[in-house]
Swiss-Prot record:
Region (Disordered): 1-29
Database matches in InterPro entries: BTB/POZ_dom, SKP1/BTB/POZ_sf, T1-type_BTB
Xref: Pfam families: BTB_2
Matches recorded under SMART domains: BTB
The organism of origin for this protein: Homo sapiens
Official protein name in the record: BTB/POZ domain-containing protein KCTD14
One biological process term in Gene Ontology: protein homooligomerization
Residue ranges constituting the BTB domain according to the UniProt record: 33-130
Length: 255
């Protein structure tokens, strides 16, 4: 009797219905995210919330996107800036603590990082008010102050090629009427063989104290690292005695 053979049906591959595990998406940094900073070689630890405390500041802009921030070899966020006065900046961002020491230096850092509330607070302090408000307003009344200051230094350097000291004269021309006689002053200095490099300041419309202007000039030149002292040189009356010109001498010592 014939017996049929059993036919085995092909078995299809088993497919797993269990979904494959997915790698977790990176979390977006939150305001409480702790970050490590390398500020000019000095390390600080803070949070994004602290750095972003004042929208519009340079720090808030730097850390608005961590992908854009520079990092050092250890992964710290790097700020290429001297770190000496960064801690007072960070303390203010953390707690609102206003610095009480090194005010001018911290003020410059606050300006650099564009932290406007801190800048305003520091400008109300005597150390900054006198320099940035009172003195600055005074000098704004002197036309061409910065340019003439630079000219004084250039002339003094030019005369110091073979000399230990060099001098520059400063002539104050207070009014436009007085300015018309300025050439007479130059002729007088030349005739008396006192003619040196002369820089004219003025005319101006405000009422200024000459001694205050001389003090500002000497202070600003010294701030550039030069050794200089000023003194009254002479008063020149015009031939008709209508005006008097005050002339001052600035002496630079080079070695």
């Amino acid at each position: 009797m014939w017996q049929g053979c059993a036919v085995e049906r092909p078995v299809g591959r088993m497919t797993s219905q269990t979904p494959l595990p997915q790698s977790p998406r990176p979390r977006r940094p939150t305001m409480s995210t702790v970050v490590e900073l390398n500020v000019g070689g000095e390390f600080h630890t803070t949070t994004l919330g602290t750095l972003r405390k004042f929208p519009g500041s340079k720090l808030a802009e730097m850390f608005s996107s961590l992908a854009k921030a520079s990092t050092d070899a250890e992964g710290r966020f790097f700020i290429d800036r001297p770190s000496t006065y960064f801690r007072p900046i960070l303390d203010y961002l953390r707690t609102g603590q206003v610095p009480t020491q090194h005010i001018p230096e911290v003020y410059r850092e606050a300006q650099f990082y564009e932290i406007k509330p801190l800048v305003k607070l520091l400008e109300d302090m005597p150390q900054i008010f006198g320099e940035q408000v009172s003195r600055k307003q005074f000098l704004l009344q002197v036309p061409g102050y910065s340019e003439n200051l630079e000219l004084m230094v250039r002339l003094a350097r030019a005369e110091a090629i073979t000399a230990r000291k060099s001098s520059v004269l400063v002539c104050l021309v207070e009014t436009e009427e007085q300015d018309a006689y300025y050439s007479e002053v130059l002729c007088f200095l030349q005739d008396k063989k006192m003619f040196k490099s002369v820089v004219k300041f003025g005319p101006w419309k405000a009422v200024l104290d000459n001694s205050d202007l001389m003090h500002c000039l000497e202070m600003d030149i010294k701030a550039q690292g030069y050794k200089v002292f000023s003194k009254f040189y002479l008063t020149y009356p015009t031939k008709r005695n209508e005006f008097h010109f005050n002339i001052y001498s600035f002496t630079f010592t080079w070695w």
